[in-house]
Amino acid sequence: DFPALCLDNPVAYLDNACVTLRPHSVINAISDYYVHSPGCGGRSVHRYGTAVSKTIANSRKTLAGFFNAPSVNEVIFTRNATHSLNQVAKGLHWSKGDVVLTTDREHNSNLVPWLQLEEEQGIDHRVVPSNADNTFDLEAFEAMCADAGNRLRMVSVSQVGNLDGVETPIREITKI
């Protein structure tokens, strides 16, 4: 399904926060858009713009159902994970001393925004260390959450490491 993986000497590609490989179905849909619907959704009232607006509304509805979102208004589209993380980091109101937890295995997309906010606004960015086997240290995470107390504003972790493919136990993290 992924043409980039069918080339000579394919790679194990894990850098999806930057650019995700696209399957044929996505490539074909993008090509179809440029041929049949080259309009601006939500802005244009001509045939192309109206078609794009309907497609976006239907996509939002489908995704809201998939993610069990209470409203289609909670579904937004961004360019990529980097853009999304920057929107969250820069879009929230932060107070000096607010704690943000990340891991020691984060992609720069999930590290740089917090380092910038630490410098610019005085948030307290803390890094959860990995275990010796490079897995997520749930005990250290729980202790760091307890230490932060009510100053903990954000836990921002990658589900899978882009360099090594090691999974972060998201379900367990959400229970803490």
Residue positions per predicted region:
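Pyridoxal 5′-phosphate
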Residues: 1-176
